[in-house]
């Protein structure tokens, strides 16, 4: 059966098949692919090959090789529209696979950028990464994947919050990567509170250092009346859900205690000396970017900031205005500067701070909301303060003319052009649809992360682009590999035809071949 599947896929691109064959079984697979029913002796020959594989106890290895080959031939190129590191467990396992993958690219999401900021040395990004891991009970990526030493944080948290129930910081165990006992859950809860308070302090230091970010209103510890246990915001008082702040000095709320400073230095050392993290981040930099234009499709994770009238929003960076394509190009350059630049210390420092801004800044294309209400969601019961207002892009992207304007800005032209978007999960249980603007824009973030699935009702989308057109595959939630084996469950998916081309697209019409054909044409002219 595997050989038949491979043969069917292999008939399309024969040279590509030969290049893709696993060296160990290359000769055998080629023989199976060219099996003929016309020659009777050939059939007996094939049977001997199969019998030999079984008798030499290589059947399992051969089946695995065939399965990998089928996957390899099915997907010529994999495009990931961001957020490998969004909340769910096993991001390091995904990155291990991608680092060895034959052909992929990624358009960085805000969660990816947060990890890139942590790997660049931004301590506020490190604190955010750890806080999110604690909140969702996913410690495996940090500890097992990257060897981040969380023992100093555990020791600090146990000492500082020994008698504190830390109730509001209990992890969301429904989405945890392991089953934790009561003692471990108690420790994670304390660690969660400890790193959250440190995060608020570190972020305030960036805001003080970069007034041009315009985020002074997000320094919220100073708005607490510690004696009365209330949060004072715009003249109104809100009771706090937690009033124990042993490490916060009301007179200087953003100063790290000596113990917190020592702790963050140890965390910094651990992040900066993780070889696996360095390898994975280099992979993200090598194969990633803020956006990609591919075969008349424009791919980016979140948004291109817009004004209310649909014009491109101008964003000031270091005294210069950027918008549209040049804004995303500038941000791409800043992210790389933060990680790689060792020559200009001030330029690198600004770029590192800006990576944090990309995580939660109102004019950041990777975020594009008025605020990230982290403090409010933890400490304030009143949900009116939890609201995060999206930028104008998210309302205007439903209009075809707006999508055409964005596509034109990025030089994407042709009859069948699309924007491929992610970032905001499609809540199908509320009737939301992934297709917008008459099919010009496709939102394919449906929530692979289990944390989103109760909101979306599905487990994400895969967009398939082939010679006949576009297909959107909607996935149902997948329980576990164990259940799939024991109960014969598979990943259930529903396929929708988005666009059908009566005349199939040829390989020569794809972007990669267009780039090759132009120099070939010039060579032909030169030769003539």
Where on the chain are the PLM-derived regions?
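Feature recognizes metal-dependent phosphohydrolase scaffolds
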Residues: 1, 6-517, 521-526
